Regions:
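Phosphate-coordinating catalytic segments in nucleotide- and nucleic-acid-processing enzymes
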Residues: 42-255, 323-324, 328-354
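Switch/communication elements of ASCE P-loop NTPase nucleotide-binding domains
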Residues: 1-50, 237-353
């Protein structure tokens, strides 16, 4: 990962099926997950805007309030993705994510427009093109060029509001943030796996906190609303209970596991594993995550700065690894822990690896 926010040049030697990313505050754990998600989304403009919105960097501009320089506004928005919030036209400052053989690159470019056989074509140009005289084009503004592997560049112009792109994800992936307890998206995620064996995995996870749960469904919250919310029935009484009344922990587990089981053959990203979870249930949830990651072929990236989370991960580890991010003189470096004996020593001696 190169030139993405505070990750000027981060290399991770190896990855496991389940990866726990640890480190002190503001070292770049969440930033690492963001970079992975951008790679998985093939740099899709809509996903970039979603990330900017998550971080409060995307401002909705009301054009009715007067002249709005969208080029300036969008340039400021997207510059927050680059190291030092600075982007220029040099390759040296471009964002790069991925393996050397299959990089995703994002850089600032000039965008030109010309007529080709009755069709208006937009493309990236440089000063050599302007000097050569080979093209009859006009410069129409600046923007981002996103190149994924050997694919043609996708252009994100700053001079107008963009339209939703038609860029497909590399693989299925879901991203769960610390504040995600009652996602509206959960309804869609549940519908995708309803009546399949994956619905059973969700129920098993909820039983970590409430063993008497029998069934789960998303129902209209009342007769006056079309909004669907999760309800469960209890084995002993048959009573139907709204899940939101059972506490944050069980709702967090629902969000986590619904997202995970929708990533079959893909990647699951979980920021701050321990959020909303009492330490007594963390080991059981890790056990479920390890089982599902293997059964559904899902690669997992989770972050934490909690000793309870780290120790519970180590207690049930099955081929996973811990990646510690360190700030060494302003440069973020990664240290991998994957050896079982090494992890056992960490757990038994309380070694500081956060």
């Amino acid at each position: 990962i190169k030139n993405y926010k505070n990750l000027r040049e981060l290399s991770i030697d190896s990855l496991a099926r389940v990866n726990l990313i640890v480190g002190c505050n503001n070292v770049g754990k969440s930033t690492l997950l963001e970079a992975v998600s951008i790679y998985l989304a093939n740099g899709n403009d809509e996903w970039l805007k979603t990330i900017l919105d998550f971080r409060g960097e995307m401002v909705n501009v009301d054009s009715a309030k007067g002249d709005v320089d969208f080029s300036q506004v969008l340039s400021e928005h997207y510059s927050s993705l680059f190291s030092g919030r600075k982007m220029d036209f040099r390759n040296a400052t471009a964002i790069s994510i991925g393996e050397q053989s299959d990089l995703l690159n994002i850089k600032l470019v000039h965008i030109a427009e010309e007529q080709r056989g009755g069709t208006i074509v937009r493309w990236v140009y440089n000063d050599d093109d302007a000097d050569s005289g080979e093209h009859l084009f006009r410069y129409i503004g600046d923007g981002l060029s996103v190149v994924s592997g050997s694919n043609a560049p996708m252009l994100i112009p700053f001079f107008r509001r963009g339209f939703p792109g038609n860029v497909k994800d590399r693989v299925p992936f879901e991203n769960v943030l610390p504040q995600d307890f009652h996602l509206r998206k959960n309804v869609l995620l549940f519908d995708r796996i309803s009546l399949s064996d994956r619905e059973g995995y969700v129920l098993d996870a909820l039983r970590i906190i409430e063993p008497s749960i029998d069934r789960l469904n998303f129902l209209n919250e009342n007769e006056y609303s079309n909004r669907r919310v999760p309800f469960v029935t209890l084995k002993d009484t048959g009573e139907r209970v709204r899940l939101s009344s059972m506490g944050d922990g069980i709702n967090r587990i629902l969000t986590v596991i619904l997202a995970l089981v929708n990533c079959k053959g893909g990647v699951f990203l979980l920021d701050e594993f321990e959020t909303g979870l009492h330490y007594t249930v963390q080991t059981q949830l890790w056990r479920v995550i390890f089982m599902l990651s293997e059964k559904l072929n899902v690669q997992v990236f989770a972050t934490s700065h909690s000793h309870d989370c780290i120790n519970s991960f180590i207690a049930v580890n099955r081929g996973g690894q811990i990646i510690r991010l360190d700030n060494r003189g302003g440069e973020i470096v990664a240290v991998n822990y994957s050896d079982d004996k090494e992890m056992e020593f960490i757990a038994q001696n309380g070694v500081e690896i956060r």
